Amino acid sequence: METLTAGWVLPVTAPPLRDGRVAIEGGRVVWVGRGGDPDEPEAPVRRLGAGVLLPGLVNAHCHLELSHLAGQIPREGGFVAWVEALVATRGNVSENGIIDRAEAAIRALEEHGTVAVGDVSNTLVHLDLLWKSRLAAVVFLELLAWDSARAEATLEWAETRLAAVQGSLGPDLEVRLAAHAPHSVSPALLLRLRGRGGPAAVHLAESREESRFLVSGDGPWAEFLERRGQGHLAFAPPGVSPVRYLETLDVLHPRLVAAHCVQVDAEDRRVLARHGVHVVLCPRSNRNLLGETADAPALAAAGVPLALGTDSLASVETLDVLDDAVELHRRFPQLEPEGILRMATAGGAAALGLADLGAIAPGKRATLAYAPAEAVPDEPHRFLLSGEARLERVGAA
């Protein structure tokens, strides 16, 4: 057993503790309190300093296999132009190059206080890296097939791929089937995924182009499909928002992780809340690609469960979800700092179904993060969201 001390301990699911202490044993938290509490266990003390100890962060939406695209994709031409450039560029590197950059990204995550990821992959080429890492990972094997005739074959390929990697999985590494987005996956494939209890994740209501295509069937996304040789495929636009379209297909459920949700209205928010969908906000990526971000205060007020993610290095500078927490605080100063940090910890753990992460409490895993400080901060949450704090991983290996 060992006791960690810090200027502040932020359990997240309980009030913050000035001069807090956390006792850990066997990789688990066994006690949380203050020095001198009568029930404090006897154990050697490791004094971290004047800074802030908190649960390790959860990056609930990233794309590790796109890490080789850092700085490669122009962002100035709008969302569809960015997608088109990404599609054209992502294959211009060897598999070893993809793996090398993914490995570097995983190391950076580990070093800076992230303990779990919701990672979207089309290939699973880096699965072995995650197995060897210190991260808990839920990997979403993402399916794309706009042609309804390919739905069955696409799902068969995915199930074969899942069966092939079962021996590489474990308690800290899981693979679930996901759909890319409502405007890139055919209704036939979405319904087949529903038949398997999914999809487990989706990009949802990210861009205005997506919304326009589903309402009217035209616009920049329809033109993109035409350039891709898929403009001839029959599609009757549902005439509703992306959120309500997925509701009509009965694929919204409490285990669904929906990234972005920028283009949503009040009724969409009520739908998401009613179905218990976990929405992962990616404020830096949305800012960079769209010039706007999801209305986090309105989503929170509607009762939508919220988490934070970074998206990929093709659209942001780092995979540090603390940077997204800082951006969300800058964009929406009316949000309580405690709530933003909850999104980056407990919210992400809940979205990914990682019940033993996201908080400092007895029984939880002692995979923690520490932000050093020269003096004990007056307001620990605001200190973490100042843009000056940097995290390091502490606690259990």
Please report, for each region that a protein language model flagged, where it lies by residue:
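Active-site metal-binding motif and surrounding structural segment of the metallo-beta-lactamase
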Residues: 36-54, 197
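Histidine/acidic residue-rich metal-binding segments in metalloenzymes
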Residues: 128-132, 155-278, 290-306
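N-terminal metal-binding scaffold of metallo-dependent hydrolase/deaminase domains
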Residues: 1-40
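Active-site beta-loop-alpha junctions enriched in small/polar residues
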Residues: 63, 122-123, 142-146, 180-182, ...
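Active-site gating loops and adjacent loop-to-helix segments of metal-dependent hydrolytic enzymes
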Residues: 68-100, 134, 138-144, 208-255, ...
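Alpha-helical scaffold segments that flank or form the walls of functional sites
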Residues: 52-53, 70-134, 156-170
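C-terminal cap of metal-dependent C-N hydrolases
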Residues: 365-397
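Histidine-centered catalytic micro-motifs
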Residues: 55-67, 199-208
